[in-house]
């Protein structure tokens, strides 16, 4: 987990200048300060060549007009490198201080921030702000929870496709309930305060049971509502089925209140901040709210550093994002 490396960094005496938005803006008011912070966060001590992974303090520092701007030349393979290569900051014309501000606001706001608002805040176009936020969301996927044990709540929800918000000409018949004609299905698992979500094509037993078997360790207890898609779970786990349609919401102290509470946070965030999300990008937004939920016990500074470290894990281009 990335958080272990970040925690280790601060335990070694690394100063955290990110406990408030004002402190963060004052601490990172130049490109050099942002770059040096990234180098400390990623490299700890000595520069690491992105080509041959050579780690040494005497890599050449290349200067332009007598000034060093973070470009190194590897002393072993002779390839130029810098701390931004392989991260979401690579080849970006946006200054790092604007990236830092965007990441801080994105992670500290409980419901996120819209691209329109971010564009106004940092002085970029809405298209650029949307791409920045999408890159941030994509980078957070590297810390997505991949396995669960213990008591694991599972549930599914439907997002989008509300007919009452459409004109009569665009309304689709028979979209109520579990219809997927105009709605996307999101499946979620929650255990020990951590949640993971996945867009699924349907809520059939084969679909849901396969995900549960892949993500929940054997010997765990799986808790669900009475939906028939969970009817085969008992063959693989101890299964607590709580039939909500019969007015039952707790069974032997087991419930699905936590995962249902997460659905409320997700839907309120999408409706209140983003208003609507296309099915194509819905997974990124689900991952955003999963990250925010999974780091709910972090303060703003630790959450910012955690998200910043995720920037080193994955990078997506604009072409791939809109493809």
Locations of regions flagged by a protein language model:
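Residue-level recognition of single "structural anchor" positions
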Residues: 1-323
């Amino acid at each position: 987990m990335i958080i272990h490396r970040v925690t280790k960094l601060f335990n070694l005496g690394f100063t955290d200048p990110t406990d408030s938005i004002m402190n963060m803006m004052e601490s990172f008011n130049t490109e050099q300060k942002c770059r040096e912070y990234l180098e400390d966060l990623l490299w700890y001590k000595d520069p690491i060549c992105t080509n041959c992974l050579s780690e040494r303090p005497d890599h050449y520092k290349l200067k332009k007009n007598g000034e060093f701007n973070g470009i190194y030349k590897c002393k072993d393979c002779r390839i130029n490198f810098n701390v931004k290569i392989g991260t979401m900051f690579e080849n970006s014309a946006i200054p790092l201080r604007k990236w830092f501000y965007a990441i801080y606001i994105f992670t500290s706001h409980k419901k996120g921030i819209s691209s329109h608002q971010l564009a106004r805040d940092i002085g970029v176009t809405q298209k650029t702000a949307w791409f920045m936020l999408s890159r941030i969301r994509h980078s957070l996927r590297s810390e997505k929870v991949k396995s669960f044990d213990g008591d694991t709540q599972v549930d599914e929800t439907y997002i989008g496709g509300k007919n009452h918000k459409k004109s009569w000409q665009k309304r689709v018949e028979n979209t109520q309930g579990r219809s997927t004609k105009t709605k996307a299905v999101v499946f979620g698992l929650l255990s020990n305060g951590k949640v993971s979500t996945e867009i699924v094509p349907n809520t059939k037993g084969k679909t849901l049971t396969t995900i549960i078997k892949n993500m929940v360790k054997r010997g765990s207890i799986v808790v669900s509502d009475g939906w028939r898609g969970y009817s085969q779970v008992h063959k693989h786990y101890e299964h607590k089925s709580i039939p909500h349609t019969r007015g039952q919401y707790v069974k032997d102290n087991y419930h699905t209140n936590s995962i249902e509470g997460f659905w409320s946070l997700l839907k309120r965030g999408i409706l209140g901040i983003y208003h609507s999300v296309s099915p194509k990008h819905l997974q990124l937004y689900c991952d955003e709210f999963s990250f925010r939920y999974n780091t709910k016990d972090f303060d703003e500074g630790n959450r910012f550093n955690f998200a910043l470290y995720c920037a080193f894990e994955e990078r997506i281009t604009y072409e791939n994002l809109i493809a």
